[in-house]
A protein has these predicted regions:
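Generic secondary-structure boundary/loop-capping signal
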Residues: 15, 53, 58, 95, ...
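Non-heme Fe(II)/2-oxoglutarate
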Residues: 3-92
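Intrinsic-disorder/low-complexity coil detector
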Residues: 1, 14-16, 59, 143, ...
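A residue-level signal for beta-strand positions that form part of recognition/binding surfaces
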Residues: 18, 100, 136
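Active-site region of the double-stranded beta-helix
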Residues: 67-99, 107-121, 128-133
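Short, charged N-terminal helix-start/capping segments
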Residues: 34-53, 97-122
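Solvent-exposed, well-ordered amphipathic alpha-helical segments
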Residues: 28, 32, 100, 163-165
Length: 170
């Protein structure tokens, strides 16, 4: 195969970032969250059906004074604000709201189907527990044209990949 190396400019129009943060004091936080999630599971083993296949999905959390869901929401505010700043979005901190939060328990052969969270500026995921070999979080290219027709590629690049995976960490 002939190599066609050239000097050129590459303009990365409309990139789709995925921000990754390590939450401060996550080990202690994860212990509290795990207890809260398992308590929620014990109260409602049926859970609700959303994108989960063979896994458990909680009802949306109530942000009540003194519960870990509210504490967690306050802890992650600075990461949300940082993401807004990186996008260059003006915001008033008091007006930024988490619209919904829930937990998922996926065991072996459980997963979540590809889905979106509409009517939000950002979506996020936080892993309380992520054992080795528990699978990846998979992101699909949101550009609809990318799924229509594309040439066979020899090597996946940031320009040609329609799926990207990240190994979750606690």
């Amino acid at each position: 195969v002939q190599d066609y190396k050239m000097n050129n400019n590459v303009y990365k129009f409309f990139p789709q970032p995925v921000f990754s943060y390590q939450v401060d004091n996550y080990q202690n936080l994860n212990k509290k969250l795990k207890k809260f999630i398992l308590d929620e599971f014990e109260k409602d083993k049926a859970g609700i059906k959303r994108s989960n296949i063979n896994g458990w999905h909680s009802k949306p959390f109530r942000f009540e004074k003194g519960n870990i869901a509210l504490e967690f929401a306050k802890i992650i505010e600075k990461y949300i604000f940082n993401s807004f700043q990186q996008y260059g979005w003006p915001f008033i901190a008091e007006k930024v709201k988490i619209t919904e939060m829930w937990s998922i328990i996926n065991k072996k052969n459980s997963f979540n189907e590809s889905h979106i969270h509409p009517n939000n500026y950002l979506s996020s995921v936080y892993y309380v527990q992520a054992p080795k070999n528990s699978g990846n979080i998979v992101f699909n290219n949101p550009n609809p044209v990318s799924r229509n027709k594309f040439p066979l590629d020899i090597k996946k690049t940031e320009y040609s990949a329609n799926i990207q995976k990240i190994q979750p960490k606690e």
